[in-house]
Amino acid sequence: MMGELALRYPGNSLVVSTGAYPGAAASDAQFPQIVDRVGIRATRLRTLQGLAAWTWRAGRLARRTRPRFTWCGELKPAGYPARWLKVRHGVPYGVIAYGTELLLLDAKIHRSAFKRWTARQLLGQAAVVVAISEWTASLARTVLERLGCSALARGVEVVPLGTTPEHFRPGVDPRDVRARYGLDGGPWLLTVARLEWHKGIDAVIKALAGVRAAHPGTRYAVAGVGDRRPQLAQLARDLGLGDAVRFLGAVPDADLPALYNAADLYVGASRRHDLLAEGFGISLVEASACGLAVVGGRSGGVPDAVRDGETGILVDPDEPAAIAAGINRLLADAALRQRFGAAGRRAVETFYNWDRVVKDLIRIDAAFRLPAPPAAR
């Protein structure tokens, strides 16, 4: 998300402060903004050394560029240098909230007075909290109320995420991707996600037997990596579906538009699992951008990504029978799939896109940023 901000904020109006990684220089060349990288790998910014280096570097950057507002792409670790800039330079900051980090934070502030104090210093001192879905916003309000930050809770803003309709679009030739990933025959269901329990891939595998009873030959492609692949593959074999479920592994972003176009239906049956949940469901709007009808789990922030009865169907993600029923309904009705897919594409063109997201964020930061310094005479 922060990369999209850096690409789409008006040129020279934003300075990006972040960690280093191999190949960063080539990546930074695409941005119209100044990108200032701390001399520490991004994966190490959460360490004490990383936080100290980032905070010092951000302070030096602030003295040079005189920022009027700071966006934190996540509460931790970005909240630490942002809080320091507020204390030392009076720069207000906004925090973008996704969901899972708030579930974890809520659990911690119940157990630890120190965690509550830290949360008040980082989250509670923000000028504004922006949530990526209504579900995330509700969770943010709950956490803020528990921290005694009622005014901030009342001001939580909701900015649903988007995608890039120029990249994800209908009509991309899928033949090469079909051949490369072995997606012959069909119909094909598709999920693009990390292989974790809260993504609901296991529930879709369980639903697949009921789908194949009504629509023989239906198969399920899963693009992504994660720790649960062995268990998910074993589940498919145990259910006699080993040949019907294809794990594609990591799929390059360049291949994703063709992969979506190779599928007949997208399924994103995410659900709450322990302290993990789906804050929005960006792959659902990527699928919509490609003209695919979608089946989404009625859980977390997914209802903000799927317009039930317009761009797809929402189902109970904890019930494989409900997932199967939603899939069967759409596989049985090509006209309905086409209507949902076309509506999804329109929704991306008019709302679920990064240009709209950035406009919303510019509008929000304009309400909190410091006044512009007087013009030099």
PLM features per residue range, with description:
Residues 307-309, 313-320, 329-335:
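Conserved acidic donor-binding segment of nucleotide-sugar-dependent glycosyltransferases
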Residues 284, 289, 293-296, 306:
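Short hydrophobic beta-strand element within catalytic cores of glycosyltransferases
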Residues 20-22, 124-158, 163-168:
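A short, active-site helix/loop in glycosyltransferases that binds the activated sugar's phosphate group
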Residues 1-39, 372:
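N-terminal subdomain of nucleotide-sugar transferases
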Residues 244, 261-276, 292:
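Acidic donor-binding loop of glycosyltransferase active sites
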Residues 50-53, 89-94, 102-125, 138-141, ...:
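Nucleotide-sugar donor phosphate/pyrophosphate-binding loop at the beta->alpha transition
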Residues 230-255:
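Nucleotide-activated donor-binding/catalytic signature segment of Leloir-type glycosyltransferases, i.e.
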Residues 130, 183-199, 205-208:
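Conserved donor-binding/catalytic core segment of Leloir-type glycosyltransferases
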